[in-house]
A protein has these predicted regions:
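Catalytic Zn2+-binding segment of zinc metalloproteases
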Residues: 4-20
Length: 182
């Protein structure tokens, strides 16, 4: 879901970081800004200013101030796009951070925009209130239904890099050139 829906479909960026990556270089920050002009990477920011992050409108909306049914509290946290510094994310955890929880509000908004623009074509125009109505109607009733609290002895990061390196490499997909009938 993280890879195919998050990256592939909604064009979201990673919300996790690796200590060894350090600060995002200026060239990458400029690339993120360009991607955002094209509608990509709506879930990360190149600034920590709550007035300027891509999800600023959600931060100002009372309907998102107390968190949502997924248990996500919107904020501005440093560490995203695999870098510890210079890129910010909207929540402490999410599908694009740990791959174990649902999508946060900025990610859900990006998914909504993509689905609606592809399904309705060029006459469709984004309406924030229509998104919020749809989003609020489809949230779980409470966070207990979607998030299982970790025990104190459980590791927070689901993907330990050293353990991942021990796994066998998967084969590349084989393309036959044949059309798949639908």
């Amino acid at each position: 879901v993280h890879e195919s829906c998050g990256h592939g479909f909604a064009k979201l960026n990673d919300e996790y970081s690796y200590e060894e990556m350090g600060a995002a270089p200026e060239g990458l920050i400029e690339q993120v800004k360009l991607m955002q002009e094209l509608g990509w990477s709506a879930n990360i920011s190149t600034t920590s200013d709550p007035e300027l992050v891509p999800w600023a409108h959600l931060l100002k909306d009372d309907r998102y101030k107390s968190g949502d049914g997924n248990g996500f509290q919107l904020t501005v946290l440093e560490g995203a796009g695999t870098y510890v510094k210079n890129l910010w994310r909207p929540t402490d955890d999410s599908m694009m951070h740990n791959n174990g929880y649902g999508f946060n509000a900025p990610s859900r908004e990006a998914i909504y925009k993509r689905v609606m623009s592809l399904s309705n074509g060029s006459p469709w125009e984004y309406d924030y209130e229509e998104f919020v109505t749809f989003d609020q109607a489809h949230l779980p009733v409470n966070s207990a239904s979607t998030r299982t609290p970790l025990r104190d002895d459980e590791q927070q990061d689901f993907f330990d890099k050293e353990e991942m390196r021990k796994l066998p490499r998967l084969h590349s997909p084989i393309f036959t050139g044949e059309r798949i009938p639908f």
